[in-house]
Design a protein with these regions (language model features):
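N-terminal positively charged helical leader segments and presequences
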Residues: 1-77
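Short acidic active-site motifs
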Residues: 9-10, 34, 87-91, 121, ...
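Structural motif
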Residues: 16-20, 63, 95, 128, ...
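Conserved, mostly hydrophobic/aromatic
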Residues: 23, 92, 100, 125, ...
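Glycine-rich phosphate-binding active-site loops on the catalytic face of alpha/beta enzymes
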Residues: 28, 68-76, 99-113, 136-167
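Alpha-helix-loop-beta-strand connector modules within alpha/beta enzyme cores
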Residues: 36-54, 75-86, 115-135
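CE4/NodB-like, metal-dependent polysaccharide N-deacetylase domain
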Residues: 45, 91-97
Length: 167
């Protein structure tokens, strides 16, 4: 997941990703033209490293998008949705994305003061999700290894790739 607080560290964070990772370009505060330029730059940098690049939101950001995140209807490639509550899980059950990002699994700077998702809630989500669930929010490799036993399909983060959390 990208966001504005990554600043100039975005491309260093992409270098830290394991080969074959997915990158969701968000940066919602940018104008559409700026988001398109950023998306193209991320694609040029990430694609040779074997990464998928998905756009967040309804507006097309590039000619060749590997997928869409939180976009209404269908889009090119992989479709993913955010899931912060039961209403969003019900929405995912109706729209049938290929992946859900469940968040916040742990305390995170993206949701300051927000409570982490209780393990019982995550277990219930994993049981009822129509697709694979990606854990997001305060994630590290160690936390992901523990959650793998619960059945997560993978994990995502922001700060961990900036070197601000232990991996």
């Amino acid at each position: 997941m990208t966001d504005e607080r990554m600043g100039d560290r975005l491309f260093a964070a992409i270098r830290r990703l394991p080969r074959g990772s997915g990158i969701v370009v968000r940066h919602y505060s940018l104008s559409l033209a700026e988001r398109r330029r950023l998306f193209a730059a991320v694609q040029r940098y990430a694609t040779p490293r074997g990464h998928m690049v998905l756009r967040a939101g309804p507006e097309r950001l590039g000619r060749r998008e590997d997928g869409v995140h939180n976009a209404p209807g269908t889009g090119p490639g992989l479709r993913t949705h955010a899931m912060h509550d039961w209403a969003e899980l019900r929405h995912a059950r109706r729209t049938r994305p290929e992946l859900i990002f469940a968040s916040p699994v742990h305390a995170t700077r993206s949701h300051p003061g927000g409570a982490a998702m209780p393990r019982a809630t995550l277990r219930a989500i994993l049981r009822h999700a129509p697709c694979g669930v990606i854990a997001l929010g305060g994630m590290t490799a160690r936390r992901a290894a523990h959650l793998k036993r619960l059945g997560i399909a993978g994990w995502a983060g922001i700060d961990v790739w900036l070197g601000e959390q232990p991996r």
